[in-house]
């Protein structure tokens, strides 16, 4: 069917039709084209995803990377994109070249397709013959197949019902497992007992903490005593600090004055720059033409401004002589500005180039659009011209009708022959089916149980897989939800940016969808055509049935056919004339085909041009997409800048908060300094350090003044960097101080001298210069100085924060300006996009119009074709009629002309004869006169001469009378000829009427021919369906067998596994319960230890966390500084692009105005310092409390460690028990491995069964091959018959033509003979008369020269007439002999024809009888099949009921065991609670005994399942030592009792209500272990026996297969000649596909084993092992039947 579908798909692409190029391509090329498009779409998608990922990375990147790096990255990206663009253009060019090559290849393939199409038509004729033979087979097999299918479906439904019931049972078991889980949850509720123990331990910890607190209070008293001693020294130091503070304030005021002066100068510079920038903005907005000129002016203005700035800076340097570094800074600034200007110029040039590039692209696109429009109009005109040419191509189908007429006669004969063959094949198939059904019934009964077992095992495996999959599904759902949340967040962020891309992508998708939709519509049309053909096939089948009913009218029709055949002989002459006409028409057709090929080439060219147009459209769309992406990138860039600004503001707020925290820490440090001021030695060291710090502060003050001047010359970025670096250093120093102070608190009593050195270090780090001589001064003055320096630093920090805020405001303004400009650019780009979209819409509309016009043209073409076909048919009919009429007319005219010629000859002869007679008479009179004048002797005898004259006169009179009579006769002949003419005319009219009747009959015959052809096509389709359904039947039979085997195996495996699982589960549950109790106890103890350790670790971590927080804050501060630096660098570039200088000047003005606010902020900062000092004191108190808690927790830890040691001893005991349990688990694993071996054996059995199935399939293939041979022979006979019949018909027609021609010649010869004889007789009479006259008249003078001449002429005529007579007589004899031979041949042919008719009638009768008998047999088979199905269903129901009873029994037993386990668990929980309440001082021996008791009790309580319990009947119970379990009457219970030798096997009430003794538990344990060992031994024995039996089964099966193969070989021994030919062909052929085709034949003949097959296949492949192999018997059919 696939081949036919492909043919049907390829057929529309004939040269006559003008369809698109995609339709002309084959299916594989179309698929490749679609794949290429999908790859391009995927590439675009991947590119989009990569861009989105990069956007997300840029967003997720910290602000530290800076906008400068981003700009660099973006520029690099831009360059990369431009390179990619160039590469894509090159790829486009290469793709164009490839496309051109592909088109050429397509054209070549079209030509090849044409040749292949011709070959296909030839093969199609051969296939039609085969299909007609196989048609009847299909009908019978279809009915059988439908019945078998219905039965198999019923069986499948029953199997599915059984599986559903089993799944319900498994659900019930899952519910029971859920109950076990609930019991485990109840066990966890026991934990409150352990929690009470934890509370007891916590009380002990509280006691230890109280003790630690007492020691801490003692230490605090000692510290207070020391602090009072140090306070005096601190007071002296504070006074000195106040003095230094006053000096420092004066210096700060002087620096502030200098800063204000420099700020005013800077404002003036900024104003100038702002004016310049405004001018630049106005010039840019004016027009794009004057950009370059104005840009140069701006550069000159900027340079002047920079020179002015340099002059101002020089003036400042004169004013501020102390600042030597100002000039260098100004130069650096100028260089920096020049660099930024160059960068701006480069960016500006890049933007200009892009704008020009876009304009050029737009112009090119417009030109392309116009060019495409012009091309389209030209193409339209060409198409209109070509339509006219296509109309001429419609005359091709005339030849097809004549071919079909010739095929009709052959089809009728083949139909009868196929009916006979079908009946024979049906009988053979019935016998085969009966054998197969009997074999299937036997195998089904034996294999049903095996397959049930296998199905049960598979069901269990599938359920486990289901549970795993559900868990995985839940995990996947959770992951999916988390991912979905993340994706929603990302989608909200990327919604605006990806909106336009998605819209454009959707438009592309819609275009592709429309293309796909068009292709689908074309496919649908193809399928509709296919459906229409199927409908015609059905209709032909109905007409075929009608034809069968009309066969009764055959004898009557045969009589008419005979009559018609006689008439056809007359018309065969006209056919010869038609042949000449046909040759002329064929010459015309050839010329038309050439014109058609030219037209097709032109169409191809037009399609190529259309493809180019589409590509240009796609390029335009890509450019639009790129522009849209650029717009989106600019928008994204602006949004990123806004985010960065927001992040900067957040970072500044965080830094301020960190400063507050640092201030608080400083206050705490000040408090600590007061505490430590009691030591005099420390104070003296501190005073020195303070003096040093004062000196450092003065140096720092000078450096700050210089830094301020540099700050004024440089940009705000440099100031921020310097201050931030200073703040970082100070923060680091503060962190170090905190660490030192913590160490001092711990080692205060031991290391007083170390504290002094730390204070000196602290003061040095603060920057104050304190001399060693000032140790004796008050410490208070030193502290005051330190406080003042800190206050100044805080004020500076506030100033810096204020300045940062101002810079942030400036940045926000700049960002707004950038946004406005970006909005303007976006609007421009949007306008461009709108223009492109409008152009795109116009182009689409034009395309739609073109397509609509194309469709209209195609519809017009179809209409014209239909009209042309109709007219052509009418013309042909008219030509046939005209030719027939012309032939009849020509015949009648020939006849009339002959008659007219005959009449004219008679009329011409009359005057000639009369003239001759007159001449003769005149001559005679002249002679008489001469004789009278000359001879005087005549006078003497007057009487004698008178008498002679009288006699002559009488003779003459007689002759005249005779002539008159002849003339009358001639007149009568003329009258008769006229009458014959009238009669011939009447006959022509009757012939015309007969011609019309023959034409009507001919039309009827052509209609019947068409019906027969359609019937043949339907028969073809039916045969294909039959092949498909037979293959499906085989597949479904195989499936049914496989399912049955699987069901048996699964049921067996289920039984075995259920027995094993029940025993293993019981043991495992006991072990798991014990392990869980031990683990829970151990875990609880470990949890307690871990909690104590965690509490300790938490305290340590809190201390470390504070240190880490300090370090993190310092690092964060450093990162923020770096981020600020990078952002400022980027902002400088952007400011220069958007005339940054104006805003900088305005900001400087604002700075000058806001100097008054600085003092207010300094006051706020001092307040914050005080609050921070208070917070520091609070934190110190908290640290002391925490240290006390640490001591308490250490004591608790010691107590817990003692408890841990006791618990570890108990854990070791539990571990010993666990090892024993593990040994038991190892044993169970071994048993599971044995069961897996049994499963592998089952799988081997399945493989052997599959081998048997393959053997049966091979038999089927052998039968198919035999069928193919018979069909090929039949086809050969049919062809031979056909050729012989056609030869006979040709010879008949030739002989008939010759007979007619000879008859006409004979008639003509007879007519000529009659005329010649009459003329001869007349001449004879004349000659005699002349002789008589000469004899009578002995006058020599009478013999004149005239008489001699007439005599010679007459003699010549006589000779000629004699020759003609002889020729005509010879011809007559030849014609008579030929006529006789032809008549004899005609008689023999008629006899043969009659015999054939009689034989066909007899064969039809026989076939009908056979059909009736087959139908009766079929009914019998159906009844037998239904009986077998009912028997099988009843057996299946019985098995199902028994299985259900077994499952119910197992469920009841399971429920009982669960109830007993629940009761035991409740008891165990109570006992555990009692054991926990008992003191821990109990000896380990008692604990071991209690555990053993528990284990033994658990072993005795749980029922032990035997492997043989499942196979027992319903009345029997399980083999257990439990008191509740029913006593079994089987032999296995007795063997266990003998092994155990214990009196406790009797039925007793449940023992777990009372507490068991140690001895009872030991006895029960020993009994259970013995029973388990006994069961293991039995299992091993049964497995060993099973393995031996499986090996025996394998051997037996292999022997059975070998014997079966021998029997099948004996069958094929009858056809040894065929086997010899096949083997010879296999040996002499080269290794490859041809050898592989012979493999199934050799396999079926010799019945090879799978190993032998493999070897033969390897030999057949040879070097071409990897080549493709043909499958099935159909591939061999072609090579065998000779139908390649």
Curated annotation (Swiss-Prot):
Location of Phosphoserine modifications: 11, 236, 1483, 1487
Variant or mutagenesis effect after changing residue 1618 to A: No effect on interaction with RAB6A and RAB9A
Protein's GO biological process: Golgi ribbon formation; late endosome to Golgi transport; microtubule anchoring; microtubule organizing center organization; protein localization to Golgi apparatus; protein targeting to lysosome; recycling endosome to Golgi transport; regulation of protein exit from endoplasmic reticulum
Subcellular location: Cytoplasm; Golgi apparatus, trans-Golgi network membrane
Annotated GRIP domain residues: 1609-1659
Residues forming coiled coils: 110-1618
InterPro entries: GCC2_Rab_bind (IPR032023), GRIP_dom (IPR000237), MT-Golgi_org_protein (IPR051841)
GO terms for cellular component: cytosol; Golgi apparatus; membrane; nucleoplasm; trans-Golgi network
Sites bearing Phosphothreonine, chain numbering: 14
SMART domains assigned to the protein according to its UniProt record, in alphabetical order: Grip
Outcome reported for the amino acid change (mutating residue 1595 to A): Decreases RAB6A binding affinity by 2-fold. Strongly decreases RAB9A binding affinity. Strongly decreases RAB6A or RAB9A binding affinity and abolishes Golgi localization
PROSITE patterns: GRIP
Membrane topology note: Peripheral membrane protein
Region (Disordered): 1-22, 1475-1502
Tissue occurrence: Ubiquitous.
Domain of life: Eukaryota
A GO molecular function held by the record: small GTPase binding
The protein's role, per its UniProt record: Golgin which probably tethers transport vesicles to the trans-Golgi network (TGN) and regulates vesicular transport between the endosomes and the Golgi. As a RAB9A effector it is involved in recycling of the mannose 6-phosphate receptor from the late endosomes to the TGN. May also play a role in transport between the recycling endosomes and the Golgi. Required for maintenance of the Golgi structure, it is involved in the biogenesis of noncentrosomal, Golgi-associated microtubules through recruitment of CLASP1 and CLASP2.
Record protein name field: GRIP and coiled-coil domain-containing protein 2
Source organism of this protein record: Homo sapiens (Human)
Gene: GCC2
